[in-house]
Amino acid sequence: LPRKTLRSNTSKRKHKGPDAQIVAFGTSLPPGMVARVCDLPGGRLGKEIEKFPTRGRGYKLIDSKPGSSGTRPFYVTGFDDNCARTFTAALALFGSPTMHEQLRYGLPSKVQPYSLTDQAYEGIKRSVCGASKNKPCGEKITKLEKNTVFISMYDRIGSNASWSNILIHDGWVLAADRKG
């Protein structure tokens, strides 16, 4: 039987963000990098471990080797171009704008300088919520929660001196960075 491959329409939108590079399915990337995978083998990505938002259409976080403690490709599906986004990590999880604001405007903010994902989020927050820098979104946070998500990626399970983040908003990967 022929292998079913999901097709992509990469001509719809020009990609200029951190996910502009297209790589082959199964590629391991350096820490903090994100790329697109458009040659997806149907149904063979791995196990869905999380969805954001939890209801309706959204992004699915897929672990290519669930149960492994080593680094491996992860995939995020749900983009209009039908290409998954991939990165390499030992552990990955979604984080909401509410969680980001608790970390960014609370005590941890005194330790970590502003990163590319923080700066990109400030721009989104200002346009959606009207909130100034270093101030939480407020009552309009639920609007951000519908189409904005962070992904935190860790090189190993346990203590990590550094980690990476990706910010997705309204179907676009806006920023990716490495902290620590």
Where would I find each of the regions flagged by the language model?
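Non-cytosolic coordination micro-motifs
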Residues: L1-L45, A89-G180
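Compositionally biased P/S/T/G-rich terminal and signal peptide-adjacent segments
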Residues: P2-R13, L40-G42, K47-D80
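Mid-length scaffold segments of soluble, non-membrane domains
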Residues: G70-H100
